Amino acid sequence: MYVIIVGCGRVGSELAKLLSGEGHDVVVIDKTQEAFKRLGDTFNGLTMVGNGFDLALLKQVGIEKADAFCAVTDGDNTNLISAQVAKKIFSVPKVFARV
């Protein structure tokens, strides 16, 4: 599966490591470069600095081919907006939002 995760805090980083470890293609988006330190050295996915509702960034990471999208930042509004964009604009089949 190709999975995009928005938010690299405790939840996002653990989810990214788990999915990457199981062989899934994972992209993690976070607003700070510092957050990616949580992923450790074994994470083999892609990391991008930005926000989860930036249309250009989402296109850049290949949201059109994403099988799943997980918005798990610490901000409910960010998660809901990002999830809406993924579902309504890009028709990602499986969309999850942490609220």
Describe each region flagged by the PLM:
Residues 1-99:
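Cytosolic regulatory regions of ion transport systems
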